[in-house]
């Protein structure tokens, strides 16, 4: 059922907001599910460029509503980034597109890795020769041949593409993701009334200095789970009997989000890779519009558990505390170690070569 109405200020100038309902539309379950997918896609399209709907709008020039050209990622002097990270930015600049720029930091035992980012865009935003330009970036990134063949084959089914970089302990990783919202919508139309999971992303990840170190990652979306169902599924991945602190901290973040948004606004994914122990979850809560500073207590406990010096954490936290929290990923790494990763601050930028 859809309800339409107007919001009005509460009586006496208080912060209370009242809703006056005017109309309602009753839909079949299939129509409602299709509408939910379309709304989800539209909102994610917007948020991939501008951030959460209720957060501050993308930075603009005073004279224009267009996003300012980004010559380097804010908060990171380009000379401080490693050569491979800078090379990826230069490749994306050749597209001349507005992209979503998202950062993250990964915490595990005695390790805090913060040199991580994703650059994402809609395939349709490339007006000419989109396929050729995207494949060219993959080639110039040095994507391994087996990945390049598979990526090229599946690119036609994707509607979003993301490229990323992360600094790992003693090495670095390039990443390329395909996102399949359009394909999911078609699957739902072809199989009405069925509740199931969907492959939302494929992630191609490799060490640019050693192509033997590579992994194909599958991100499976489980729609419309309740908060309790999400907690139960995360417990199967990050067993609280063995990994109590990170499990409880991820749950604490979910609790904070649950106070601001319904469970339908949470995007829950499970992550797997073939031939290694990697298994994790990803809980996207951008719509809760939480700032990282609201997670400080939980993040401090996480650093204490993983033996991260407080000054090392504060050096990162003090620069990003007002950024919008996005999603938390947690589970078991390829090496069999537990971890949590915090994603934050997706913003829209126009990256140009000018």
Language model feature labels by segment:
Residues 66-354:
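Structured alpha/beta or helical-core interaction and ligand-binding surfaces enriched in interleaved
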Residues 1-65:
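Positively charged, low-complexity terminal tracts
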């Amino acid at each position: 059922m859809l309800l339409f109405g107007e919001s009005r200020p509460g009586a006496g100038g208080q912060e209370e907001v009242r809703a006056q309902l005017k109309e309602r539309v009753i839909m079949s379950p299939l129509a409602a599910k299709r509408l939910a997918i379309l709304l989800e896609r539209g909102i994610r399209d917007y948020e991939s460029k501008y951030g959460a709907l209720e957060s501050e709008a993308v930075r603009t020039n005073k004279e224009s509503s267009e996003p300012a050209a980004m010559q380097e990622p804010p908060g990171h002097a380009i000379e401080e980034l490693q050569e491979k990270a800078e090379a990826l930015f230069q490749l994306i600049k050749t597209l001349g597109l507005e992209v979503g720029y998202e950062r993250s930091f990964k915490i595990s035992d005695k390790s805090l890795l913060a040199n991580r980012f994703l650059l994402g865009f809609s395939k349709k935003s490339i007006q000419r020769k989109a396929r050729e330009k995207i494949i060219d970036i993959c080639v110039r990134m040095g994507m391994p041949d087996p990945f390049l063949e598979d990526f090229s084959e599946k690119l036609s089914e994707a509607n979003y593409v993301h490229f990323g970089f992360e600094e790992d302990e003693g090495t670095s990783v390039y990443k390329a993701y395909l996102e399949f919202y359009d394909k999911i919508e078609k699957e739902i139309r072809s199989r009405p009334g069925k509740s199931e999971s969907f492959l939302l992303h494929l992630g191609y990840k490799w060490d640019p200095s050693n192509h033997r170190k590579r992994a194909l990652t599958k991100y499976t979306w489980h729609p419309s789970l309740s908060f309790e169902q999400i907690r139960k599924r995360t417990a199967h991945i990050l067993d609280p009997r063995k990994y109590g602190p990170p499990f409880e901290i991820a749950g604490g973040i979910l609790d904070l989000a649950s106070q601001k948004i319904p469970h339908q606004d949470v995007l829950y994914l499970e992550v797997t890779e073939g031939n290694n122990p990697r298994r994790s979850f990803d809980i996207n809560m951008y719509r809760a519009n939480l700032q990282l500073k609201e997670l400080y207590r939980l993040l401090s406990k996480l650093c204490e558990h993983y033996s991260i010096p407080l000054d090392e954490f504060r050096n990162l936290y003090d620069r990003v505390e007002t950024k919008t929290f996005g999603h938390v990923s947690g589970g078991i790494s390829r090496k069999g170690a537990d971890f949590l990763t915090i994603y934050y601050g997706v913003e829209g930028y126009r990256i140009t070569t000018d």
